[in-house]
């Protein structure tokens, strides 16, 4: 007989990657963070819970994937798609990508919960959840439904982005939720030309990530440079490990190492 598992809420360490607004590179960070952790030797899963803008399938080059669904009696389990050593599930596998989803909060939150619970994960160490941007009903319901290990907040250095990121961090740390903030990732910290890796141009200001980490008494996990090749690679389904500019690989390896260390500290 074949036994189909669903993930017990205590079998893996679920980590939300969140932002207060769109456009800060949250999904790109989540996608590359998951690959970096997997390359460190851990069994890693990535849940694309960005329900209104699922972009992980495109970033991993698996847009046309069709996850297998196995039914045993009354129970159905979805087999995740594996790419770059990461087991991936996304709402994008099950909806027409040419149509926009118009779901109310409870329906959207329930869809995220089903992705999380009804998938055959099998021996996962870390689960990265690419969380919808914002601080509304979907976010609150999902946080309450899932047994989270912690959240990582993605922001860019400028104040307008930091203001929204603060709202996201405050949501996680309310008395009703009390989800630990495992750290801040400052994305697009500076621009570095591929032919001049030692040069830094601070296009969006400087020091925002440090400032926010201090405000919330948490860690600045790292600063990710703005590298044009990252966006171009994502459009082709490639990760940071498929390009020449190694400064961004160094940044993500540092972030992953610090994040995993911080998880041990809050355990």
Each language-model region and where it sits:
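Short, small-residue-biased leader/transition segments that mark boundaries at the very start
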Residues: 1-13
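Walker A/P-loop phosphate-binding motif and the immediately C-terminal alpha-helix
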Residues: 14-50
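Residue-level signature of catalytic and energy-coupling elements of molecular machines
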Residues: 22, 56, 89, 112, ...
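Short glycine/serine/threonine-rich phosphate/pyrophosphate-binding segments
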Residues: 24-32, 54-55, 131-139, 162-164
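Switch II (G3) loop of P-loop NTPases
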Residues: 91-106, 115-141
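Conserved catalytic-core segment of NTP-binding enzymes
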Residues: 125-126, 132-232
């Amino acid at each position: 007989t074949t036994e189909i598992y669903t993930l017990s809420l205590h079998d893996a360490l679920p980590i939300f990657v969140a932002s207060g607004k769109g456009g800060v590179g949250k999904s790109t960070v989540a996608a590359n963070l998951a690959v970096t952790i997997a390359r460190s030797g851990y069994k890693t899963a990535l849940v694309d819970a960005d329900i209104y803008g699922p972009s992980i399938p495109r970033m991993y080059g698996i847009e046309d994937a069709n996850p297998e669904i196995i039914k045993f009696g009354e129970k159905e389990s979805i087999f995740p798609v594996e790419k770059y050593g990461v087991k991936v599930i996304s709402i994008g596998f099950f909806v027409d990508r040419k149509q926009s989803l118009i779901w109310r909060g409870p329906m959207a939150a329930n869809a995220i919960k089903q992705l999380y619970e009804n998938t055959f994960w099998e021996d996962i160490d870390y689960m990265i959840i690419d969380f919808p941007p914002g601080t509304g009903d979907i976010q609150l319901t999902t946080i309450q439904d899932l047994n989270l290990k912690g959240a990582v907040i993605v922001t860019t250095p400028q104040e307008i982005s930091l203001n929204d990121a603060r709202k996201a961090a405050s949501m996680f740390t309310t008395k009703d939720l009390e989800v630990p903030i495992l750290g801040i990732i400052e994305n697009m910290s500076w621009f570095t030309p591929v032919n001049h890796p030692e040069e830094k141009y601070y296009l969006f200001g400087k020091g925002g990530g440090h400032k926010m980490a201090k405000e919330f008494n948490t860690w600045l996990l790292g600063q990710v440079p703005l590298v044009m090749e990252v966006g171009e690679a994502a459009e082709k389904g490639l990760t940071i490990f498929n390009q020449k500019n190694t400064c961004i690989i160094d940044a993500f390896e540092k972030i992953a190492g610090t994040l995993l260390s911080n998880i041990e500290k809050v355990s």
